[in-house]
Design a protein with these regions (language model features):
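Polybasic (Lys/Arg-rich)
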Residues: 32-127
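Core beta-strand-centered patch of the WYL/Sm-like small regulatory domain
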Residues: 1-39, 45-48
Length: 127
């Protein structure tokens, strides 16, 4: 299956061909374990833990990142959540956008991707 951004479609042409949806396929099921749209065929669901500062954490509590979101810790210092999702670019971009208000606790692989992206951001802004 391919996903195309509507903002990238400039012309539509009817090819007079039909497409049969595979038996048992559901669009909701296809996107059930992702934040955003992108995923690869063999991507696995992982358990993600993210620590948020109190201000950002309140926002995340009221507007969950994903339907799998569970609150693990909710105290004066932090709000920590657990997600069960596929790690993809949209998730990484979302976490980077939270800046120092979010910290990936688990898994180490996601934490390393965030660190690598942050290092690239620093490199791109050096004079």
């Amino acid at each position: 299956m391919r996903v195309f951004g509507l903002d990238r479609i400039s012309q539509i042409e009817n090819m007079l061909r039909t497409f049969d949806v595979p038996s048992g396929f559901s669009i909701e099921g296809y996107f059930y374990n992702v934040i955003g749209l992108s995923q690869k065929k063999d991507d696995a669901v992982e358990i993600i833990e993210i620590k948020f500062n109190r201000t950002l954490g309140n926002y995340i509590k009221n507007l969950p990142l994903h339907h799998s979101q569970q609150i693990l810790i909710d105290n004066e210092e932090e709000i920590r959540i657990r997600l069960k999702v596929i790690i993809n670019e949209e998730l990484i971009n979302e976490l980077i956008a939270y800046g120092d208000g979010a910290q990936v606790i688990k898994p180490k692989s996601l934490k390393n991707k965030i660190i690598k992206r942050a290092q690239l951001i620093l490199e791109n802004h050096k004079e």
